[in-house]
Amino acid sequence: MIALRCAGFNNVQLETAKQHNIRVCRVPAYSPEAVAEHAVAMLLTLNRKTHKAYNRVREQNFTLTGLLGFNLHGKVVGVIGTGNIGKAFCRIMLGFGCQVLLTILLKLMI
């Protein structure tokens, strides 16, 4: 069995797996909330520069120069796409007190 920890399976040769009687399974969809929360975690890491602070502490450097972030409250956040993940991200950002601007992507049938 090949168990993929992702939604896509384009990196597996399905015909070859079938010929060798190997089952292929995948995650059909991730939790939109989990993905949105991870995006917020990355946003906070970049904003508060915790990745830089972590590296400095490991180097025994405890200076605060260049580590100042800013409050998200009152800031404008732009979100492209309002699928399940985009909606979950918007709800979290609204909870931070941000103004949220949305762009809805539409597929036009021409």
Give the location of each predicted region.
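An N-terminal-biased, well-structured beta-alpha scaffold segment characteristic
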Residues: M1-C25
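Short, surface-exposed linear patches
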Residues: C6, V24-R26, L46-R48, L101-T103
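Short, acidic/turn-prone active-site loops that include or flank metal/cofactor-
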Residues: C6-F9, A29-P32, L106-K107
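Mobile beta-alpha loop/short-helix "lid" or hinge segments that flank ligand
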Residues: N11-T16, H51-F62, G97-Q99, T103-L108
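Phosphate-binding beta-alpha-beta segment of Rossmann-like dinucleotide-binding domains, i.e.
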Residues: H20, P28-V76, A88-R91
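Rossmann-like dinucleotide/phosphate-binding beta-alpha-beta segment
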Residues: T65-I110
